[in-house]
C-alpha cells in the first residue's frame, strides 16, 4: 500500500506540475509526500520478518545497477512511444494504423538487439553491452531532439534503429544480471523486481517526458490572443485538441492556433528528448561503474 501510494503521489505530482508550476506549493508538497511514503515503505520492509521486497538485495551493486538499467530502458521506450505517436498522427497526419506500421522498426530492432545482446554478453561481458545499449538510447534521443517538420521518415527510421537496438542490448543482459545476482531461493523476488522496474520505469517515462513536453508546449499559448468559450485552455491540453479547435475557427485565428500548437509541440519534443537522453546517460554511467565486467560464478 505504501509503495503504491508513494509512486502514485510521485506520478500525479509530476503530471500536474506543468499546470500548477514546478515550484508551486502543491507541487513541492506532492514531492515531499511521495518521498515520505517511499521512506516509510523502506523502513517497513527493513523491519518486516517477511518483507514484500528484500531491500538487502540492493546492497549488491550488480543487482542495483541492472535494475537501474532496466528502469531506464523502459523509461526511454515508453517516453518515445508517447511522443512519436502524437508526432505521426498530428504533425504528419497519419491514422492510427499508419502510425503503428511506421513504429514497427522499433519493435524489430528491439528483437534483434535482444538476441545480439545475449550473444555479445558471452564475449564482451554485461558491463560493456549494457553500457553500450544505454549510450545508444542516449544517442537516439539526442538525434530525435533535432526532429522538425522537414525530417524525412528515413531519418526517423535511423533514430528508431538506435533506440530499438539500445533497448534490446540493455534489457536482456540487464535482466540476466538481476536474476544472476540472486540465490535460487530468491528467484521469485528477483523476477518481481525485474517486472517492477519495467513498470516503474515505463510509468515514470510517460510522466516525466510528458510533463516536460507539456510545460514547453503550453508556453507557446501564453502570447496567443484569447479564444472565446475557453477554447485556448482546451487547446493547451494536446496538439490534437488544438488542431481540432483550429478547424472550427476563421482563417486568421486558426492559422495562429495551428502555428502555436506546432511550434509548441516541437519545443516540447526537443526538451523531452533531451531530458530522456540525459537520463540514459546517467544510466550508462551507473552501468559502467557498478556492473561487473564478468559476473562471478556462483558456487
At which residue positions do the language-model features occur?
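Membrane-interface capping segments at transmembrane-helix boundaries
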Residues: 43-49, 289-298
Amino acid at each position: 500500500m505504501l509503495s503504491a501510494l508513494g509512486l502514485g503521489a510521485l506520478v500525479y505530482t509530476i503530471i500536474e506540475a506543468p499546470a500548477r508550476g514546478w515550484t508551486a506549493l502543491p507541487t513541492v508538497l506532492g514531492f515531499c509526500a511521495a518521498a515520505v511514503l517511499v521512506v516509510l515503505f523502506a523502513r517497513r520492509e527493513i523491519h518486516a520478518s517477511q518483507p514484500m521486497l528484500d531491500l538487502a538485495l540492493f546492497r549488491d551493486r550488480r543487482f542495483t545497477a541492472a535494475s537501474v538499467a532496466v528502469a531506464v530502458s523502459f523509461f526511454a521506450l515508453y517516453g518515445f512511444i508517447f511522443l512519436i505517436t502524437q508526432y505521426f498522427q498530428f504533425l504528419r497526419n497519419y491514422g492510427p494504423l499508419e502510425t503503428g506500421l511506421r513504429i514497427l522498426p522499433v519493435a524489430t530492432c528491439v528483437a534483434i538487439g535482444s538476441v545480439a545482446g545475449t550473444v555479445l554478453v558471452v564475449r564482451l561481458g554485461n558491463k560493456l553491452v549494457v553500457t553500450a545499449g544505454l549510450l545508444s538510447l542516449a544517442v537516439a534521443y539526442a538525434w530525435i531532439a533535432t526532429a522538425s517538420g522537414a525530417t524525412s521518415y528515413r531519418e526517423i527510421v535511423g533514430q528508431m534503429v538506435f533506440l530499438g537496438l539500445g533497448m534490446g542490448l540493455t534489457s536482456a543482459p540487464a535482466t540476466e544480471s538481476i536474476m544472476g545476482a540472486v540465490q535460487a531461493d530468491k528467484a521469485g523476488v528477483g523476477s518481481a523486481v525485474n517486472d517492477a522496474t519495467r513498470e516503474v520505469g515505463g510509468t515514470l517515462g510517460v510522466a516525466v517526458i510528458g510533463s516536460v513536453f507539456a510545460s514547453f508546449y503550453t508556453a507557446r499559448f501564453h502570447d496567443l490572443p484569447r479564444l472565446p468559450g475557453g477554447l485556448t485552455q482546451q487547446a493547451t491540453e494536446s496538439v490534437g485538441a488544438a488542431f481540432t479547435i483550429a478547424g472550427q475557427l476563421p482563417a486568421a485565428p486558426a492559422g495562429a492556433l495551428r502555428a502555436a500548437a506546432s511550434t509548441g509541440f516541437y519545443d516540447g519534443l526537443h526538451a523531452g528528448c533531451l531530458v530522456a537522453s540525459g537520463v540514459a546517460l546517467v544510466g550508462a554511467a551507473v552501468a559502467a561503474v557498478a556492473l561487473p565486467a564478468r559476473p562471478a560464478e556462483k558456487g
